[in-house]
Amino acid sequence: MTINYQFGDVDAHGAMIRALAGSLEAEHQAIISDVLTASDFWGGAGSAACQGFITQLGRNFQVIYEQANAHGQKVQAAGNNMAQTDSAVGSSWA
């Protein structure tokens, strides 16, 4: 009986997570544009409230990016580790 694991799928999933993390920058910039368009709500684009909101938004996006990217790396590493272990065990049984 042969069991076939799709380690490439695990690697691709990790790569997709990392790519999605990278695409967050475009979303971040779109939100900043909307915030600046509605900056009167905070007292104008140059106001401390508006700039503070933009700064905090940037920090939040940075944390999300870092966590998603790190998770993608861990998924890829886990897939690679499983593939190496499977290969080592398989060759020892040959």
Curated annotation (Swiss-Prot):
Entry keyword set: Secreted
Domain of life: Bacteria
InterPro entries for the chain: ESAT-6-like_Myco, ESAT-6-like_sf, T7SS_ESAT-6-like
Homology family: Belongs to the WXG100 family. ESAT-6 subfamily.
Compartment(s) where it occurs, according to its Swiss-Prot or TrEMBL record: Secreted
Protein known as: ESAT-6-like protein EsxI
GO CC annotation: extracellular region
Gene encoding the protein: esxI
Organism: Mycobacterium bovis (strain ATCC BAA-935 / AF2122/97)
